[in-house]
From Swiss-Prot:
<comment type="similarity">
    <text>Belongs to the metallo-dependent hydrolases superfamily. Adenine deaminase family.</text>
</comment>
<dbReference type="InterPro" id="IPR032466">
    <property type="entry name" value="Metal_Hydrolase"/>
</dbReference>
<dbReference type="Pfam" id="PF13382">
    <property type="entry name" value="Adenine_deam_C"/>
</dbReference>
<dbReference type="InterPro" id="IPR006679">
    <property type="entry name" value="Adenine_deam"/>
</dbReference>
<dbReference type="InterPro" id="IPR006680">
    <property type="entry name" value="Amidohydro-rel"/>
</dbReference>
<dbReference type="GO" id="GO:0006146">
    <property type="term" value="P:adenine catabolic process"/>
</dbReference>
<dbReference type="GO" id="GO:0000034">
    <property type="term" value="F:adenine deaminase activity"/>
</dbReference>
<dbReference type="Pfam" id="PF01979">
    <property type="entry name" value="Amidohydro_1"/>
</dbReference>
<keyword id="KW-0378">Hydrolase</keyword>
<dbReference type="InterPro" id="IPR026912">
    <property type="entry name" value="Adenine_deam_C"/>
</dbReference>
<keyword id="KW-0464">Manganese</keyword>
<dbReference type="InterPro" id="IPR011059">
    <property type="entry name" value="Metal-dep_hydrolase_composite"/>
</dbReference>
<protein>
    <recommendedName>
        <fullName>Adenine deaminase</fullName>
        <ecNumber>3.5.4.2</ecNumber>
    </recommendedName>
</protein>
């Protein structure tokens, strides 16, 4: 038994901090005593020399009297439950769950609710099963992907059908909690049979239903919510967040690597002024959604807490990654008897400096849980289906990347023709559409003020290439096989030779990232598991840092994470102008690059 005495215990349900002690027996919390050690004679409380006290405790909790009791005086350090990341795509960190957990546990994250639609878009149901079972200590729960592919306007590797979803729900796996983010909100509003069948399947098995409704408002939002959607993580304005909360949605405030919306916590003051705080605060959570391996390794949710306390109290910040998501997902994340002893010991609640992490009753630094050779062996044995034949297109030439109307060819073009340009907006996933006169577009393309962007279908060798123009790079060419949600190959650049080199090198690597300039490969990151992940976290962390550092001056957009931001340019369910292997997509419709 371990007794943590003189602890400031964070009560996440009531928002309190009370001095006391916590007893840990095996992997569970045995007792919690609220004793103010600052105003109590400590000599008789859990004194190592007080054998009577030890025996009494052992008898009470049915432990053998000869078993040792380890008493640790925390001297007022703060103890709170470990954290939940309530909505995350682990694949965005480009490492497997067994690698992800090494960093997550270090920063006190013991539970994650994943929506593995990234790997599902590549290899289908097998990818979901892999993501659920790969981690060893991290508690991985799953929302089954609802929109694979995200829309019918792109080509993915394998669909997830209503039948697939029912088979997963029927397994009665306690870690399968519901239906993942319903991105096809237009289909929901228009009662598209395919997505409605999936929603009804979740209702049939009493599962939760996560939402995805960027900029959806008023009647459309009401219709969306009325179909049974329960949460949303796509808010970007305070009005949007308040409207969704008032309609009963759980609000997931996202603070990821590409999209940063923690400023939405300003609404908590509004709730307090309106007198609705007590009713609605419990429905607010902090989530990552998509996080890079760099941000994962360098702080994860601890960094999110540090940002959150600019808007809320430390306890409120902690509640949004413990009790609030726990209540939504039906989990138990309090410090109370019979719960698992998953605890974080903090030196303070200002900088959130972690002293220790306890997982299932054991201090993290004492757990001999990672045998590197076994991890590599297990990944290899279990995941050959994720590794081989990931990039399935023929080698490309410069001619494959000529654009009708820009490089000649196609229908006759008048000097009054307009060209659509994709314009990313800072750290937002939303893009603008710019219309340029065709001659102006050609001039800007020649001067590297705008770039070519292509999406190559890579799963079924259909030879489809979506073609467009974008305001993104000052120089160089970048390409990636990680591009939401179907993870076709996306490439941006101006030099046709470099573009061909980049996509052909990705094929040879089996997937990943590559940067090319003046005919030379500047840097690369190999992601040979479905073209989106790898099994060596330290390698991927180093190589992603290397490629980001070598390309950081290439971006037109200040402080832009080039590869992560690029990965969302093909996510056509996010407004306004995106690109898939079908071409340019606007408002869920294919639009022409050149308007005659």
């Amino acid at each position: 038994m371990i007794i943590l005495k003189n602890a400031n215990i964070v009560g996440v349900r009531n928002g309190t901090i009370v001095n006391g002690s916590i007893g840990i027996n095996g992997d569970k919390i045995a007792f919690v005593d609220y004793i103010d050690y600052n105003n109590h004679n400590n000599d008789n409380i859990y004194n190592k020399n007080e054998n009577t006290q030890e025996i009494r405790r052992k008898q009470r909790f049915n432990t053998r009297s000869e078993a040792p009791v380890k008493i640790i005086d925390l001297k007022g350090k703060f103890v709170c439950p470990t954290f939940i990341d309530a909505h995350i795509h682990i694949e965005s960190s480009h490492i497997t769950p067994s690698e992800f957990e090494k960093y997550a546990l270090k920063y006190g994250v013991s539970k994650v609710i994943i929506d593995p639609h990234e790997i599902a878009n590549v290899v289908g149901v097998n990818g979901i099963k892999f993501m659920l079972n790969d981690a060893k200590l991290l508690d991985v729960y799953c929302m089954v992907p609802s929109c694979v592919p995200a829309t019918e306007l792109e080509t993915n590797g394998a669909p997830i059908t209503s039948k697939d979803i029912e088979e997963l729900f029927k397994q009665n796996n306690y870690r399968i909690l519901g239906l993942g983010e319903v991105m096809n909100y237009i289909g929901v509003i228009n009662k598209d049979k395919n997505i409605i069948d999936k929603i009804n399947m979740a209702k049939k098995y009493n599962k939760l239903i996560d939402g995805h409704a960027p900029q959806l408002t008023r009647e459309d939002l009401i219709n969306y919510v009325n179909m049974g959607i329960m949460s949303d993580h796509e808010c970007t304005t305070e009005d949007e967040a308040l409207e969704k909360l008032q309609l009963g949605l759980k609000l997931m405030v996202r603070e990821g690597t590409a999209s940063k919306n923690i400023y939405l916590l300003k609404i908590i003051d509004i709730l307090k002024r309106k007198g609705t705080y007590n009713k609605l605060f419990k429905n607010i959570m902090l989530v990552s959604d998509d996080i890079s391996v760099k941000d994962l390794k360098e702080g994860y949710l601890i960094n999110t807490l540090k940002k959150a306390v600019k808007y809320v109290s430390p306890i409120e910040a902690i509640q949004m990654i413990t009790i609030n998501p726990a209540n939504y997902f039906g989990l138990d994340m309090e410090i109370k008897p019979d719960n698992y002893a998953d605890l974080i010991i903090f030196d303070d609640l200002e900088e959130f400096k972690i002293n220790s992490v306890i997982i299932k009753g054991k201090f993290l630094n004492e757990l001999n849980k990672y045998n590197k050779n076994n991890n590599i062996k297990n990944n290899k044995n279990n995941n050959d289906n994720l590794i081989n034949k990931s990039i399935n297109y023929n080698y490309k030439t410069e001619n494959d990347f000529l654009i009708d109307g820009i490089d000649g060819g196609g229908a006759p073009i008048s000097t009054n023709s307009k060209v659509r340009i994709i314009e990313p907006i800072g750290s937002s996933l939303i893009t603008n559409e710019i219309m340029l006169n065709i001659d102006d577009a050609k001039t800007k393309l020649k001067n590297n003020e705008i770039n070519r962007i292509f999406v190559l279908e890579r799963h079924r060798n259909t030879n489809k290439i979506g073609k467009g123009l974008i305001k993104y790079l000052k120089t160089g060419t970048i390409a990636s096989s990680y591009a939401h949600d179907s993870h076709n190959v996306i490439v941006i650049g101006n030099n046709l030779k470099d573009i061909a080199i980049a996509v052909n090198h990705l094929k040879d690597m089996g997937g990943g990232f590559v940067a090319v300039k003046d005919g030379k490969i500047i840097e690369q990151v190999k992601l040979n598991m479905g073209g989106i992940m790898g099994a060596d976290g330290e390698y991927i962390y180093k190589k992603i840092n290397d490629i980001e550092n070598k390309t950081k001056n290439w971006s037109i957009i200040e402080n832009n994470n080039l590869f992560l931001s690029m990965s969302f340019l093909s996510l056509s369910v996010i407004p306004n102008l995106k690109i898939t292997d079908f071409g340019l997509i606007k408002n869920n419709k294919i639009v022409n690059l050149v308007e005659l």
